[in-house]
Structure formats: C-alpha cells, structure tokens
Design a protein with these regions (language model features):
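Short, solvent-exposed loop/beta-turn-alpha elements that line the ligand-binding surface or hinge
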Residues: 65-68, 83-108, 156-157, 170-179, ...
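Short helix-initiation/N-cap motifs at beta->coil->alpha
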Residues: 36-42, 123-138
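Conserved C-terminal helix/tail region of periplasmic/extracytoplasmic solute-binding proteins
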Residues: 26, 50, 213, 232-234, ...
Length: 302
C-alpha cells in the first residue's frame, strides 16, 4: 500500500498453541479431551498448580519468559488472539484504531500463565526461550505455549504419543477454535542484486521446494508445512494434529501479525506485560500499550 510493499506467496505454513506433555497430564488425572474451553484449561491448570509437589512438577505452565528470545510468544503470538477475534466480530482484516474488545480474555490467559507457572512473575523478565523449553523437556511443567517448529527439538526427548498441541482457548468461541495457523514468512529477492545473484537465488528457492533433499529438509528437519505440490507428507505430529482439527470442522485462528503497527508497538506491549507480571505495572498500562500505542504507531506508518 503506502509503503509500496508486495507480499505474494508464503513459503511455509506453521501453527502454534499449547504444547502438552500428555504423560504428566494423565498423571494429574486428565487427558486432552478434558480441555475444550478456557474454563476447562483454567480448572485443570489450577488443580495441577495446587498439587505440583505431589505431581513432581514446578508448575502447570512453563515460564512465560519476557526476555528478547521469548517475549514474542506473548507480545505477538498471544496478542494475535484478541486482534483476530476483534477482526472477526467487526468483519475487518485491519484497522487504524484497535478497540481492545477482547483484552479481558487476553488478561485471563496471561494471568493463568503467570500464576500457574514454574516461577514467580517477578522472575519472568530474565527468563529465556531456552528456559521455557528446558522446563518442558525436563518435566517441570505440563503446558508450553509454542509452535510446530518446536517438534524437531522436542522429539529428541518425547515420542509422538507423549505430545499434543491444543488451541489457546480464549473464552470467545472455544467450541470452534482450532490452532493458530498461518505465516509471516515470505521469500523476497533484491532486484538491485546482480543478474547472476538473482538467478542463483531463484534457483536455490526452486531447489528448496522441488528437490528431494530440499523438501525433506524443510518438511522433516525444519518441521515446516510447505504449501507446494512437491511437498512431502509431514512427520511432525503437531502439523498432523492441526490437519485433524481442521478436518473436524474447527476454525484455525489466522495470523494477523502483518497488521500490527510496528516493532515499537510490540516492544511497548512487551514492556507493559513484563511490568504487570512483576507486580510493578497495572493491566490498565497493558491496555494503553495495546490500544493507544496502536493508533499512534499506525498513524506514524502512514
């Protein structure tokens, strides 16, 4: 649009949700079939948290780390859900003035993450993506918000039968909600590069999605779903589960990251969430960072 930017074909499709250690969940007396709504999730998570010593875990959820390696999970991925539901309710796909209709739901989920956690909220500012992943791998927590891209690492420790991914139930349309599935990944070629380099780049991109080695690497090694006719069937259990949710009639939550105003908006939201989790900021500050900064940053991008 105004920035004269063209986004055409995505080269990968991914999903995110709540990754579940089914073995630990069953040890607590539940299965994934017991969790079909936000209320169900809260009931199960609260119970696990109350019985964490008995169950041998440190918390229901892995740490919601807010350092730079991890905060995108909450200032972007989790923040996508209130945006998605507002867009759906208003019949739009972008806006210069987000209303924050579903920020109470955002709060409910984030509150669950920081109260039923492996650590105190004041510690989250220094918690990393590796911390969160390792807590899950070590059996310290039952739930771990992340995506299909985590499969390659988790499969080194867990069998497919021990893992599941469920939607981040938001308390809006839980009975119809699937995983958050989409992309923000596109290949671009610099037109100012030499003809030789442009052609070499195009040849490599073609190799990635047509050759046996390229498609295997992208599908199996990287855990991607690649939307090309030459794609091999995924071995990633989370990708398979996403397909099962869709086949069952559940609606994938679309990715609306490209409509977020700017990185500055995300960073401001991340800071407000971090302070809120630590008890030194209010939820009103989070709402302001979400709603007021959206309008400001959208205006600056025009």
């Amino acid at each position: 649009r105004q920035r004269q930017m063209c986004i055409r074909d995505r080269y990968v499709i991914e999903s995110y949700g709540l990754i579940v250690n089914k073995t630990l969940l069953e040890k607590a007396g539940y299965t994934v079939d017991d969790i079909k709504s936000f209320d169900d999730l809260k009931k199960v998570a609260d119970d696990i948290q109350a019985r964490k010593d008995e169950l041998g875990v440190k918390g229901a959820f892995t740490s919601a780390g807010m350092d730079g390696s991890s905060d995108w999970r909450f200032k972007t991925h989790l923040a996508n859900l209130p945006i998605y539901y507002e867009y759906q309710a208003d019949g739009i796909d972008d806006t210069d003035a987000i209303k924050g209709t579903y920020l109470d739901n955002y709060k409910n989920v984030f509150d669950l993450y920081i109260t039923d956690s492996t650590c105190d909220g004041a510690e989250l500012s220094a918690k990393t993506a590796d911390d969160s992943r390792n807590e899950f791998i070590n059996g310290d927590a039952v739930f771990y918000q992340n995506g299909t891209w985590e499969y390659a690492e988790l499969s080194k420790t867990f069998s497919d039968d021990e893992l599941a991914m469920i939607p981040i139930y938001f308390g809006v349309d839980d009975e119809n909600e699937g995983l958050a599935t989409g992309t923000e990944n596109y290949w671009c070629v610099n037109k100012n590069a030499s003809d030789e380099d442009v052609q070499a780049t195009l040849d490599f991109m073609n190799w990635c999605v047509t050759s046996e080695a390229g498609t295997k690497s992208m599908s199996e090694d990287m855990g991607f779903t690649i939307p090309f006719k030459t794609a091999v069937a995924p071995t990633n259990v989370f990708v398979k589960q996403d397909a099962e949710y869709t086949a069952a009639g559940l609606t994938p939550v679309s990715w609306n990251f490209t409509t977020m105003p700017s990185e500055e908006w995300k960073n401001g939201l991340g800071t407000a969430l971090t302070l809120y989790a630590a008890g030194s900021g209010s939820w009103d500050d989070v709402v302001s960072a979400f709603v007021d900064n959206w309008a400001t940053e959208k205006a600056l991008s025009e």
